[in-house]
Regions:
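Glycine-rich nucleotide cofactor-binding entry segment
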Residues: 1-108
């Protein structure tokens, strides 16, 4: 991926020797994942769980699959799934998610 020169220089300042590997990582294929809805009864078993997430799994899910359409699973990258784990909001707490589109993190936090 080609980045503006200023972007590259900024990350070289921040990351030093690790900057090249960081910038090269943008050429890697994105990791696909999904999370299951713990409020739905599961009759399917899933393999390849994402560490440190209670409902996350690696893999692809079609938006047209019965599991997705019925709300059993939701496509969501691993990093987005970690937000709820880190935030751990308590009941009744108000949360403002400034990156809430299409709403996956918001539904997970609810």
């Amino acid at each position: 991926m080609n980045f503006p020169e200023g972007f590259v220089k900024k990350y070289e300042e921040i990351l030093g020797d690790e900057a090249r590997a960081f910038l090269a990582s943008f050429d890697d294929e994105a990791v696909s994942a999904f999370r299951i809805n713990p409020l739905k009864e599961r009759q399917l078993s899933f393999s390849d769980p994402i560490p440190n997430t209670p409902w996350g799994y690696y893999g692809k899910v079609s938006g047209k699959s019965p599991e997705h359409v019925t709300g059993l699973v939701y496509s969501q990258e691993p990093a987005a799934q970690m937000v709820a784990q880190v935030a751990q909001p308590s009941s009744g707490m108000k949360v403002l998610d400034l990156a809430a589109a299409p709403g996956g993190k918001s539904t997970q936090l609810a």
